[in-house]
Amino acid sequence: MGVANDSSPEYQWMSPHRLSDTVILGDCLYFNNIMSQLDLHQNWAPSVRLLNYFKNFNKETLLKIEENDYINSSFFQQKDKRFYPINDDFYHISTGGYGIVFKIDNYVVKFVFEATKLYSPMETTAEFTVPKFLYNNLKGDEKKLIVCAWAMGLNYKLTFLHTLYKRVLHMLLLLIQTMDGQELSLRYSSKVFLKAFNERKDSIKFVKLLSHFYPAVINSNINVINYFNRMFHFFEHEKRTNYEYERGNIIIFPLALYSADKVDTELAIKLGFKSLVQYIKFIFLQMALLYIKIYELPCCDNFLHADLKPDNILLFDSNEPIIIHLKDKKFVFNERIKSALNDFDFSQVAGIINKKIKNNFKVEHNWYYDFHFFVHTLLKTYPEIEKDIEFSTALEEFIMCTKTDCDKYRLKVSILHPISFLEKFIMRDIFSDWINGGN
């Protein structure tokens, strides 16, 4: 029997490092460096004491704080030009259906609550093992189009995140009530709270108040004010009413420039593209080449990402040309950025069978499932594509579907087009800027 390594499917079942009931995959130095900056056991006094604390303030005392010159610019929203990370803190950058993501220095740290009653810790490793397996088996520059996590910690106690969220929520509730001269209460209406928070979050006076109260009340190096409404939707969603925010995984990634969906016309030009549509062709072509090269690997014609869409494609600096050979052609990318596929949480390849995807799919799928969804989301994200008649017409070949066989952009029926369909598609003149270096 061969020795399993991270280029083999069996790698996902290995436990290279053990710490009681937790496991670390990948680089322990990266992981331990991040963990040393987190207090997983931080707790706070009961909420009733926080309520009593805010009874010491009123509109007048808050006005005095607002008149103070001190302002912590990290409490502005990150899309605000006034935002600046003045501390080495964890800054909340995103919360989706399955993960809460923070940025610290040049790292991205993702916390994923796992349904431990459904899966064992080692059955939740696809986000680490699948891209690592692909990266180690792909031979050419196509491997540069994959985001590999540096490290992943399994089965960690993550209750501190939900506790922190509740503490910040209660602070914001009481602060807003004090500003409005209302009776203090920890009861809230989701709609009323979000309206009040969104009306104030960009106000310099409100940020001054946060600069005072967040350190005093929260006293944490985890800043969740940015995109707090997304975290609110995550924890308050009715489908998680009885959810146990107990254990999950911690994943360390390199920090990207942007996700692909954040690029507009102005940024596309700034990045060196002739137009936004040329940029869209660029990310489509790179993803297509990645899939084709994966399907060339032995036993990898079952690869599925299961969530291929613009916000799961990240952009990184590219310091040298990316050259990918396909049959008698070579695709040359001289752009100063590259796109890279991220978020393999629901992916599968070769012998790495993902129970999460297996339980969700009732019929067999292949690459076409991913690109059908990808094209739908591209057209939704970028209506500008319609201005390029040739490109938009070609993309429609991926979405010849009806309500009967497609639900929310996802195929419900099995359509197993061969990968040669995609190979022929990218040989068209649509992508002539990159075929044989544009010659």
Swiss-Prot record:
It is found in: Host endoplasmic reticulum; Host endoplasmic reticulum-Golgi intermediate compartment. Pfam families: Pox_ser-thr_kin. It comes from the Viruses. GO terms for cellular component: host cell endoplasmic reticulum; host cell endoplasmic reticulum-Golgi intermediate compartment. ATP binds at residues 93-101, 117. Its main location: host cell. Residues 87-439 form the Protein kinase domain. It catalyses: L-seryl-[protein] + ATP = O-phospho-L-seryl-[protein] + ADP + H(+); L-threonyl-[protein] + ATP = O-phospho-L-threonyl-[protein] + ADP + H(+). Induction: Expressed in the late phase of the viral replicative cycle. The active site is at 307 (proton acceptor). One of its GO terms (molecular function) is protein serine kinase activity. The keyword Nucleotide-binding applies. Disulfide bonds: none annotated. InterPro entries: Poxvirus_ser/thr_kinase, Prot_kinase_dom, Ser/Thr_kinase_AS. Keywords: ATP-binding, Host endoplasmic reticulum, Kinase, Late protein, Nucleotide-binding, Phosphoprotein, Serine/threonine-protein kinase, Transferase. Phosphorylated in vivo. Autophosphorylated in vitro. Essential serine-protein kinase involved in the early stage of virion morphogenesis. Belongs to the protein kinase superfamily. Ser/Thr protein kinase family. This is Serine/threonine-protein kinase 2. It comes from Vaccinia virus (strain Western Reserve).
